[in-house]
């Protein structure tokens, strides 16, 4: 009742001030009172206005019951656009003290104060009209800022009331305004904040359907029933270990590819018998199950790995210094023989005995440079035909002797008549005709002038036929010309002597003194 009487007194006082504005004469005169008291009154009213504005801002978004609306009607609303006056000419210290006590009572009400939808004056409307207007006008629902109850406690230290101090003390010192000194208005318990009843706390989530937009008389929608936590099956850690051990024992008898499948099933969460992902499972059992599954997967994959065989040791190959190309006897031979090229030419002929004897004194252990000029090593003009060359030339002679030579069958004619009539000797069958010689020698591709010179050097009979010795010497001169040697002015006698020997018989040479 004391609160109601105080609210009525304040409402009447404000109504009197509003209905009877000050006269023009009183507006020009200075108001009574000291400067410090006016400053304290201004600071107290501004602080009270800020508190009322914050209270109205938070109370706008809440629905109020009829009892709160009736109490709010008894308290005068705070004018928004009305300028604040420092003092009134008829104000007394008792009235100021009453106003300060009324502000203290309004700052700490038993019920939160809500801001009306439209401006109303005290005594203008009744409680029934206010409730009817609240049903007709929709209340806007702006986004409510989320606040953590732990970070913003409801109880905070309140600074001392400056207006009451200024009324009792003659000259108080106004303290500086504090930023965080305003006491937050106690809020009505909302659905997203914990409701404290003794020591029990329950958290109810806020949804759009739970906000009452029509009014306080309509019944609020009922929330869906929450699942009973007793129905959730809690599997103790021991049961998980038993299941994992049984599963690990069964995995040992499977194929090696089965651990991969089991691990993939565990990763995908498709094995409800091992790990229960229900929300009622406590953290200790979940952690034990995860650790046990990881250990089981490690044991499944930790198979004994056979170390790879060591690489074969490389054997050192030793080669002699003097003959690096010859293979050593210590090195192991490969099983497969080295591939050899096919021989498309004639096989290499063996070196003759005479050539070995001829180059016997020229053998050296260290081979010299091939392009260096040495007078003793250069090839000089050969003064004889070798046995090998002579055999080769005689083979050509034997294949072409007696060709295109007419031979008479009459034995009565004497040899002189044959020479005189035909011009061929009696042994013409062992000779080669000039026409056949020209065809054979032309295959050397030497110019005809060179071939003519060779013919003149070997044709000693001048009858158009060449004997065996003449034909062999002519073939030898052609080979010397092809090798780069010049033709001699006259064939030396040593060359004729080398071709006169009997074929197949070798005459040893007598060393000259």
Swiss-Prot record:
Biased composition (Basic and acidic residues): 14-23, 190-200, 237-248
Polar residues compositional bias, start-end: 88-101
Biased amino acid composition, Low complexity: 314-340
PROSITE patterns named in the record: EH
InterPro entries given in the database record: EF-hand-dom_pair (IPR011992), EH_dom (IPR000261)
Family assignment from sequence similarity: Belongs to the IRS4 family.
Function: Positive regulator of phosphatidylinositol 4,5-bisphosphate turnover and negatively regulates signaling through the cell integrity pathway. Involved in rDNA silencing.
Protein name: Increased rDNA silencing protein 4
Annotated organism of origin: Aspergillus fumigatus (strain ATCC MYA-4609 / CBS 101355 / FGSC A1100 / Af293)
Taxonomic classification: Eukaryota, Fungi, Dikarya, Ascomycota, Pezizomycotina
């Amino acid at each position: 009742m004391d609160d109601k009487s105080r609210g009525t007194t304040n409402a009447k006082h404000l109504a009197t001030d509003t209905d009877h504005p000050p006269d023009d004469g009183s507006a020009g005169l200075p108001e009574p009172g000291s400067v410090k008291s006016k400053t304290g009154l201004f600071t107290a009213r501004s602080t009270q206005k800020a508190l009322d504005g914050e209270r109205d801002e938070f109370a706008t978004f809440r629905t109020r019951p009829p009892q709160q609306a009736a109490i709010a009607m008894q308290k005068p609303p705070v004018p928004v656009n009305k300028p604040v006056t420092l003092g009134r000419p008829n104000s007394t210290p008792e009235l100021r003290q009453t106003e300060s006590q009324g502000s203290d009572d309004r700052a700490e009400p038993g019920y939160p104060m809500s801001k009306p939808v439209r401006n109303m004056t005290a005594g203008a409307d009744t409680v029934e009209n206010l409730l009817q207007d609240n049903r007709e006008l929709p209340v806007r629902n702006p986004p409510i800022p989320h606040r953590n109850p732990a970070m913003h406690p409801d109880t905070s230290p309140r600074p001392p009331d400056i207006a009451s101090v200024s009324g009792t003390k003659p000259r108080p010192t106004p303290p500086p305004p504090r930023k965080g000194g305003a006491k937050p208005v106690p809020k009505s318990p909302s659905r997203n904040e914990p409701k404290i009843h003794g020591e029990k706390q329950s958290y109810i989530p806020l949804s759009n359907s739970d906000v009452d937009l029509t009014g306080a008389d309509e019944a609020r929608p009922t929330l869906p029933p929450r699942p009973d936590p007793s129905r959730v099956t809690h599997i103790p850690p021991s049961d998980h270990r038993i299941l994992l051990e049984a599963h690990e024992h069964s995995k040992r008898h499977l194929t090696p590819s089965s651990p991969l499948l089991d691990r993939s099933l565990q990763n995908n969460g498709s094995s409800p018998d091992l790990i229960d992902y229900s929300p009622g499972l406590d953290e200790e059992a979940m952690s034990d199950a995860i650790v046990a599954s990881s250990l089981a997967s490690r044991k499944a994959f930790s198979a004994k790995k056979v170390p790879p065989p060591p690489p074969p040791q490389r054997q050192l190959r030793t080669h002699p210094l003097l003959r690096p190309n010859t293979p050593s006897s210590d090195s192991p031979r490969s099983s497969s023989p080295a591939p050899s090229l096919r021989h498309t030419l004639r096989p290499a002929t063996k070196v003759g005995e005479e050539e070995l004897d001829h180059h016997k004194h020229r053998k050296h252990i260290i081979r010299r440079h091939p392009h260096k000029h040495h007078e003793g090593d250069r090839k000089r003009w050969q003064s004889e035909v070798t046995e090998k060359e002579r055999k080769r030339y005689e083979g050509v002679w034997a294949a072409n002797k007696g060709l295109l030579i007419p031979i008479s069958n009459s034995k009565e004619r004497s040899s002189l008549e044959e020479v005189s009539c035909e011009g061929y000797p009696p042994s013409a069958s062992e000779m080669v005709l000039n026409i056949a010689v020209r065809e054979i020698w032309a295959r050397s591709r030497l110019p005809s002038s060179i071939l003519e010179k060779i013919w003149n050097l070997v044709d000693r009979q001048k009858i158009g036929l060449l004997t065996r010795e003449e034909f062999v010497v002519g073939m030898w001169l052609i080979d010397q010309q092809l090798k780069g040697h010049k033709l001699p002015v006259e064939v030396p006698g040593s060359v004729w002597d080398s071709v006169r020997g009997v074929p197949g018989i070798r005459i040893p040479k007598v060393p000259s003194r």
